[in-house]
Amino acid sequence: MEIGSSSTVAGGGQLSVPPGFRFHPTEEELLYYYLKKKVSYEPIDLDVIREVDLNKLEPWELKEKCRIGSGPQNEWYFFSHKDKKYPTGTRTNRATAAGFWKATGRDKSIHLNSSKKIGLRKTLVFYTGRAPHGQKTEWIMHEYRLDDSENEIQEDGWVVCRVFKKKNHFRGFHQEQEQDHHHHHQYISTNNDHDHHHHIDSNSNNHSPLILHPLDHHHHHHHIGRQIHMPLHEFANTLSHGSMHLPQLFSPDSAAAAAAAAASAQPFVSPINTTDIECSQNLLRLTSNNNYGGDWSFLDKLLTTGNMNQQQQQQVQNHQAKCFGDLSNNDNNDQADHLGNNNGGSSSSPVNQRFPFHYLGNDANLLKFPK
């Protein structure tokens, strides 16, 4: 047994004890020492348990009425004399002004030294309101009564009680479980959404599936929508990507790189004529800075000379048609039809029309095969 530093005895006097001592008796001590002496009217050496009329006090009022010492206290002890609920009955009246105490469970036997039975413990819960309806509270009371074969204990005799407020561990654990369940359900929903979006993106792009991570869920959710529509304009983006890095027009070396880039894009575009690429390279070499100093007027003169040559050839053909008669005219018409079918209806020579470089003293093969 421990006693507080400054305790009030039943007679009203003050008891001086060393600081740090608390009143915390065991169940055996409550029954075999305190209650037995109380019933037998024997003096108690340290009488710190007060007598309380349980029907006139509420459980929250016992905190001040039954305080022992000045230190913190979470259990309150008192003696109570049980009253009959009915004059001719045996039931105990445990009602107060605000509620009532209701017994719960079965009585527990208390043994001395694990052998001799010395008493019983009844557990009661306080309800606010009136029986049988009431609101359950967290106030608990353990009521101890003697059960000795030598003494006949009446139902309306003395009892010693311990009142405390139940620590709501179960409610805190239940709330924690609800929070854990909520977080677990949210995590499952996130994973389900993650799997759903990953499945959509895998179907839209089988060659490069998108892998989602929980932290990047919002970013990839926006990226998935773009990936779904990617096949619709992938062809156009491929062509525009290649055109964004075209070399300069007047660089022969860059023209070769452009030809290689165009050749790599053949699965997406129509086939490119190799002869046209080679002729373009030769044209760039002729018009480069090394040969003509970057003067593009040369190309204008070249095209003008080609047009004049075509007009002269047309005049010669007309003169020959008049001289040689209908036979020559028919032959020229057949030749013109043949040239028109090959060149989209044009009657002029493709070599002279496209590349009239023979006036410069260059061979036509120069335009077909790169140096």
UniProtKB/Swiss-Prot annotation:
Disulfide bonds: none annotated. Residues 192-201 have a biased composition (Basic and acidic residues). Residues 17-166 form the NAC domain. Transmembrane segments: none annotated. Changing residue 27 to K: Additional root cap layers. It is found in: Nucleus. This is Protein SOMBRERO. The lineage of its organism: Eukaryota, Viridiplantae, Streptophyta, Embryophyta, Tracheophyta.
